[in-house]
């Protein structure tokens, strides 16, 4: 079977819904990513998440590193970035486009139409959990795994004849990160652990009850002071041995077993309100999580996760290469008919959406929920000219419909902030969203005109609302979102103009995202009547 045919079969299977939803079929296969060495760089770490918290587990025996995220740690604060000069200059840009002076139009738009206050805020890392194990630099029989069946990582290795095991979950039900440390001989669990952060001016303290706290605030960016306050709390529960806490370091010596707990919380309530108490929230998560055993916590977590996972299975045959590490299977894929790797990849995609988008939280951003930087590429925002939409394309067709709730709430919120932007920039009713937004739900045109002069982000997101109705037949949902659809349609009804050559109604100025066109001799993206806009607006008006 060649690769084109294999992926063609996969596409057909997904498209027509020929995917069994039987728990027994899924249980017969084991879906996991596994490796025989620790991660060397962040992109090799294994992702865990519960929608709100993200963790990237490196699995290094001597110095475990788990990079941590909390979904509401973003730079900046509530704001609107619409440029009031746009109202005057958009007609001038439009005239230049209709005159065929595309590059001149694009240059003017960059100078006078695009946002001048900020281009949206970056999603930011919280920091890292570090766990140091003295004497574990020389190890053998190493194994590292991400189980897609149970949403947990496992690390095993051997030092001086002792077998060590680490199991990590980002609990869906307890909303904390837990790391269970065990060995096959008593009294062998000894480690020091602490929280670190790339943020400036963080405060790290040791509190009574063997607890370490790390408190900070998000970053200044493009002149907008960070106002998201956050706190992480670190503690442990040991069986046997001794535990102590001083100078921001938690130490356990000679234990039979230990559970490390991390909770993180912020002051973020919604895009307009950041008056929450991160310390109280973080403490509450931790206290509630420690009222039951790790075994119970893991079962609750796994049961919650599998309610989503087991709705859909994809069986492409035997796992004939199960003895080969995942990185080698990917490398060998050109030469092998590894159909089970395709099925694993399918479930991995579902896994990532389950872990990065849960009802009540934020949508999955450019990097889902995982980011190790303060200023990541493209700010790890919500890019609405295909990326945000792509995150959610699998949601309905793979039976994860309710995971759209964070996306739908974002759409509802930008439909409110976008009303002001439509008025300020276009003098229009309805609402507009350009090619990017962030946690503050900015809707102005950002970056430079070649990428950002595109007012159809709202129309594309509205398609997701309509598809929810098509998949579910939920008339109550449709009734609740109809005003959003109507007001997006109203905006385009008011801003579309007749182009002079044919009197066609078009959106102008706009662009086909990141595509230059022949009319400009390949020098400009700025144009009128782009096919993408035409299709999106047709879909919106005929929904």
Q: What is the predicted function of each stretch?
A:
Residues 515-543:
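Carbohydrate-active enzyme catalytic cores, enriched for enzymes
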Residues 22-450, 456, 462-469, 474-475, ...:
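Aromatic-residue-lined binding/catalytic grooves and analogous aromatic/hydrophobic interfacial grooves
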């Amino acid at each position: 079977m060649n690769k084109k045919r294999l992926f063609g079969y996969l596409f057909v299977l997904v498209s027509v819904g020929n995917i069994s939803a039987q728990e027994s079929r899924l249980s017969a296969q084991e879906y996991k990513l596994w490796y025989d060495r620790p991660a060397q760089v962040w992109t090799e770490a294994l992702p865990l998440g519960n929608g709100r918290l993200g963790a990237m587990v490196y699995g290094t025996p001597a110095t475990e590193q788990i990079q941590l995220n909390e979904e509401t740690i973003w730079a900046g604060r509530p704001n609107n970035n619409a440029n009031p000069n746009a109202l005057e200059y958009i007609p001038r840009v439009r005239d230049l486009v209709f005159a065929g002076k595309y590059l001149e139009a694009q240059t003017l738009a960059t100078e006078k139409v695009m946002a001048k206050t900020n281009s949206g805020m970056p999603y930011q890392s919280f920091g890292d959990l570090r766990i140091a194990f003295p004497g574990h630099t020389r190890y053998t029989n190493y194994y590292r795994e991400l189980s897609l069946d149970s949403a947990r990582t496992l690390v095993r290795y051997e030092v001086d004849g002792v077998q060590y095991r680490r199991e990590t979950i980002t609990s869906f039900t307890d909303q904390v990160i837990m790391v269970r440390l065990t060995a096959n001989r008593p009294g062998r669990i000894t480690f020091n652990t602490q929280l670190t952060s790339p943020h400036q001016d963080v405060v790290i303290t040791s509190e009574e009850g063997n607890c370490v706290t790390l408190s900070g605030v998000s970053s200044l960016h493009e002149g907008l002071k960070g106002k998201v306050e956050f706190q992480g709390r670190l503690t442990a529960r040991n069986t046997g041995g001794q535990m102590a806490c001083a100078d921001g370091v938690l130490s356990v010596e000679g234990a039979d077993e230990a559970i490390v707990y991390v909770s993180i919380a912020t002051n973020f309530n919604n895009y307009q309100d950041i008056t929450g108490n991160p310390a109280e929230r973080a403490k509450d998560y931790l206290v509630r999580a420690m009222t039951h055993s790790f075994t119970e916590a893991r079962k609750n977590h796994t049961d919650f996760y599998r309610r989503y996972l087991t709705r859909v299975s994809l069986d492409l045959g035997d796992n004939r290469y199960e003895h080969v590490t995942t990185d080698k299977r990917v490398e060998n894929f050109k030469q092998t008919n590894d159909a089970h790797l395709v099925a694993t990849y399918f479930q991995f995609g579902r896994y990532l959406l389950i872990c990065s988008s849960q009802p009540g939280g934020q949508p999955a951003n450019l990097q889902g929920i995982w980011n190790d930087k303060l200023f990541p590429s493209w700010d790890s925002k919500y890019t609405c000219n295909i990326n945000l939409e792509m995150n959610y394309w699998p949601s309905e067709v793979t039976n994860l419909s309710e995971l759209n709730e964070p996306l739908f709430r974002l759409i509802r919120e930008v439909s409110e902030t976008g009303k002001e932007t439509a008025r300020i920039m276009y003098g229009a009713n309805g609402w507009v969203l350009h090619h990017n937004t962030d946690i503050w739900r900015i809707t102005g045109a950002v970056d430079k005109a070649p990428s950002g002069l595109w007012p159809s982000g709202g129309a594309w997101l509205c398609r997701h609302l309509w598809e929810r109705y098509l998949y579910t037949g939920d008339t109550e949902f449709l009734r609740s979102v109809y005003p959003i659809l109507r007001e997006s349609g109203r905006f385009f009804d008011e801003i579309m103009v007749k182009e002079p050559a044919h009197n066609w109604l078009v959106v102008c100025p706009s662009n086909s995202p990141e595509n230059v066109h022949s009319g400009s001799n390949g020098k400009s993206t700025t144009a009128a009547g782009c096919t993408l806009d035409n299709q999106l607006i047709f879909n919106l008006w005929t929904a």
